[in-house]
């Protein structure tokens, strides 16, 4: 098995390529190109008749893709979220799809993108800086309740109400425009503890997920991926936190396992599985963690499409799967409220 270029270390590189089982003349889609580590691995296994489609909503990632692969006739490059992959490929035409979720290392490492609480920069956090509100814009106009709900729902931040109150109070005095401003403010109102985790970690995660609609895009992308795969095609998804992994795990199980029967309801149409689980949760081993510590939280799940089964992907069902930031924060959560 080939190894990735030293300049960029993609997470679970070998496991992803093993999971996708790339064939010489297959068609594959990388929905989160990033800096192209996984895409290069797929391309190495493709012959002249193979095809690779890459997507990313980050214009910097697209620029890297065009520089790296622009002259390769096997590669087509598309700027946009993987939630819209159904507009890029027709149904049942793809042999393998990879979704590597969350924020990429280059996005974290560049202070100007505004993702990192450890590097001072403009408070942006948009994966696509040309669309939508920045984090600074959202924090400037969101209500205290909305901020608290987002911090609790997407960050599981126990001090969500206390932090939201502090943000609203501070913005009345001066706008929050820098990542260091927000990180320092959060740290100043958090209870002292022994945790090695930065006190702003959960809040930055929550705001980023909300700004980029990450979980809604994940839901839409999973449905679109299932439609796009051929029978025998494989879906590989890498998640980095429990909210993402829970959605992926439940999605794959929904189409691989019959739901529990209910004797009180009329007998349903026999369940025909659409997916077969190829693996459970795959995590980085010690050797990879020594090289790439950021892989510690990565979880890879792989499933194979079997054929046309019974699907239930209506809007009502999807709405049950996405955490709702308007759900009430339990009274036991937050500060001494």
Swiss-Prot record:
Molecular function GO labels: rRNA (cytosine-N4-)-methyltransferase activity
Give the superkingdom in one word.
Bacteria
Q: Which GO terms describe its cellular component?
A: cytoplasm
- Mind telling me which SUPFAM superfamilies this protein's record contains? Putative methyltransferase TM0872, insert domain, S-adenosyl-L-methionine-dependent methyltransferases
Provide the residue span(s) of the region labelled Disordered. Answer: 315-337
Which residues hold S-adenosyl-L-methionine? Answer: 36-38, 56, 82, 100, 107
The record's subcellular locations are: Cytoplasm
Q: Which family does it belong to?
A: Belongs to the methyltransferase superfamily. RsmH family.
Q: What class of enzyme is it?
A: transferase
Q: Which UniProt keywords apply?
A: Cytoplasm, Methyltransferase, rRNA processing, S-adenosyl-L-methionine, Transferase
Q: Which GO terms describe its biological process?
A: rRNA base methylation
Which gene name belongs to this protein?
Answer: rsmH
Q: EC number(s) for this protein?
A: 2.1.1.199
The protein's role, per its UniProt record: Specifically methylates the N4 position of cytidine in position 1402 (C1402) of 16S rRNA.
Read off the HAMAP family from this record. Answer: 16SrRNA_methyltr_H (MF_01007)
Q: What protein am I looking at?
A: Ribosomal RNA small subunit methyltransferase H
Reaction(s) this enzyme catalyzes, per UniProt: cytidine(1402) in 16S rRNA + S-adenosyl-L-methionine = N(4)-methylcytidine(1402) in 16S rRNA + S-adenosyl-L-homocysteine + H(+)
- The primary location reported for this protein is cytoplasm
Family annotation (Pfam families): Methyltransf_5
